[in-house]
């Protein structure tokens, strides 16, 4: 099979719950006293406040089921809060039409559905918010689609039907769609799903490239803590429908919030040798950004 490569170069205060909403006014997404319920009478989120800063790469991390994807869906307008306010670029999402929202943010959401279309047709969907009456792609739109496919590493699959691709290749095609949309804010819900290790790092390098070179704001829901720590400027930590901390990555790590959420201890990389000597049998140490993470003893 033809190999495609994602184009990219591999390449700050922490707040606790009481003041988690008191962030810089320069934010891309803001949640103000948000409550949400999946079932009547049972609140999944209650009084949640958080902010995603503009101009940064932010990872939303936490255990399975803590509310990370719910947070993204509230911003994307796929869910509506039971109470409170969600803003994107200063606009209340409750008052935004879908086309208006699509001009503000591009969203890669989790989905098991495989649309019956080619890669090029899927990526072209990212241009729909920019099309005028008649909905036909112009020369600039076609150029944007080609550029997005090249950057996401799927140009060689442009004429392939999506069902012919592997899960990882389809995921990269959806990433290309978000790139073609060309918004200042990109929101990615588990973008590394189905990707192998090398492709994960290539994708994260592309994310950093979009931020550093083009000034894009990127917010990611991500389970892989190693990738979150390596590539994020800012972390939002969640547990059981609550934001427990947010801020620059190193400061959130120093606060202990990440370790508490994942039941792991985190120490500086230069303590690796001594920690290995003390590690319990079966524990596996992982290094990243100058830190060592290992499971806490039960």
Label the model's feature ranges.
Residues 84-92, 101:
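Conserved ABC transporter NBD signature motif
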Residues 76:
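Helix-to-loop junction immediately C-terminal to a conserved catalytic motif
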Residues 135-136, 161-165, 169:
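Conserved ABC ATPase signature
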């Amino acid at each position: 099979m033809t190999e495609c490569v994602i184009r990219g170069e591999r390449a700050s205060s922490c707040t606790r719950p009481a003041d988690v909403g008191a962030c810089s006014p320069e934010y891309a997404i803001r949640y103000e006293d948000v409550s949400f319920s999946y079932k009547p009478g049972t609140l999944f989120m209650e009084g949640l406040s958080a902010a995603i800063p503009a101009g940064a790469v932010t990872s939303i991390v936490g255990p399975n089921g803590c509310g990370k994807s719910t947070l993204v869906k509230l911003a994307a307008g796929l869910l509506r809060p039971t109470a409170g306010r969600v803003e994107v670029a200063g606009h209340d999402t409750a008052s935004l039409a879908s086309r208006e929202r699509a001009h503000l943010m591009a969203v890669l959401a989790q989905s098991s559905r495989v649309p019956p279309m080619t890669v090029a047709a899927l990526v072209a969907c990212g241009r729909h918010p920019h099309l005028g009456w008649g909905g036909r792609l112009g020369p600039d739109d076609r150029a944007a689609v080609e550029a997005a496919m090249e950057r996401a590493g799927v140009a060689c699959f442009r004429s392939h039907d999506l069902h012919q691709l592997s899960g990882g290749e389809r995921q990269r095609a959806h990433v290309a769609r978000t790139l073609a949309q060309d918004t200042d804010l990109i929101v990615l819900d588990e973008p590394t799903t189905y990707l192998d290790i090398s492709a994960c790092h290539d994708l994260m390098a592309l994310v950093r490239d979009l931020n550093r070179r083009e000034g894009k704001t990127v917010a990611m829901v991500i389970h892989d803590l190693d990738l979150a720590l390596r590539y994020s400027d800012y972390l939002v930590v969640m547990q059981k429908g609550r934001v427990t901390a947010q801020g620059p990555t190193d400061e959130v790590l120093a606060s202990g919030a990440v370790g508490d959420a994942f039941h792991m201890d985190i120490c500086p990389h230069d303590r690796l040798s001594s920690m290995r000597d003390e590690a319990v049998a079966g524990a596996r140490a992982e290094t990243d950004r100058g830190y060592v993470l290992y499971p806490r003893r039960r």
